[in-house]
Amino acid sequence: MTTLADLRTNYSRASLDAADVNPNPFVQFDVWFKEALDAQLPEPNTMTLATVDESGRPSARIVLIKGADERGFVFFTNYESRKGRELAHNPNAALLFYWIELERQVRVEGRIEKTSEEESDRYFASRPLGSRIGAWASEQSAVIESRALLEAREKEIGARFGENPPRPPHWGGYRLVPSSIEFWQGRPSRLHDRLLYTRDAASASGWKITRLAP
């Protein structure tokens, strides 16, 4: 039997220093994301989204990032799903990107806001037809008796809307507006590099960079 405690990797691909990063964390994220794309990593656009319920119990799931700029990080989902309900109660959330092949993580913390109706409409219209139908067919996170019922619902929605299903009112975008963004680079002997960006109105870039102990 595999002994989990014995599984370990010594990271040594790169280093991370404040003198070498961009003072703007969104620019730095774009640099790292492009490097993940260039490395042809499988689905570098996946990220873990962590939320909490009314009792303070956390939950996490993988979602896909669909936009990142100076305003924040965007993803789309069902507003009535578990994550949607939790975000309605508590808009504080965290994101985690993990690019294991590059020995890198990016941690983002902040508050969630909904994107505009126009932004949600625009992205929904760009989705494949099957995904647009699925947004109507699935009552995400609800208990269902069988997959057959889900597939029957899919056929019903397809027959109703044809090639042009509109965006459901319960489906749309969220934007995480970050208060902090941490860049993590694996290093030998577990002495990893960690640079934390936090908002700082006195800084020319609007952000302060500090180094954290690993």
From Swiss-Prot:
Gene Ontology molecular functions: FMN binding; pyridoxamine phosphate oxidase activity
One BP term from GO: pyridoxine biosynthetic process
Residues binding FMN: 61-66, 76-77, 82-83, 105, 140-141, 184, 194
Cofactor(s) in the UniProt record: FMN
InterPro entries listed in its UniProt record: Pyridox_Oxase, Pyridox_Oxase_CS, Pyridox_Oxase_N, Pyridoxamine_oxidase_dimer_C, Split_barrel_FMN-bd
Reaction(s) catalysed by this chain's protein: pyridoxamine 5'-phosphate + O2 + H2O = pyridoxal 5'-phosphate + H2O2 + NH4(+); pyridoxine 5'-phosphate + O2 = pyridoxal 5'-phosphate + H2O2
EC number in record: 1.4.3.5
Pathway the protein contributes to: Cofactor metabolism; pyridoxal 5'-phosphate salvage; pyridoxal 5'-phosphate from pyridoxamine 5'-phosphate: step 1/1; Cofactor metabolism; pyridoxal 5'-phosphate salvage; pyridoxal 5'-phosphate from pyridoxine 5'-phosphate: step 1/1
A Pfam match: PNP_phzG_C
Record function comment: Catalyzes the oxidation of either pyridoxine 5'-phosphate (PNP) or pyridoxamine 5'-phosphate (PMP) into pyridoxal 5'-phosphate (PLP).
Name of this chain's protein: Pyridoxine/pyridoxamine 5'-phosphate oxidase
Natural source organism: Burkholderia mallei (strain ATCC 23344)
Gene: pdxH
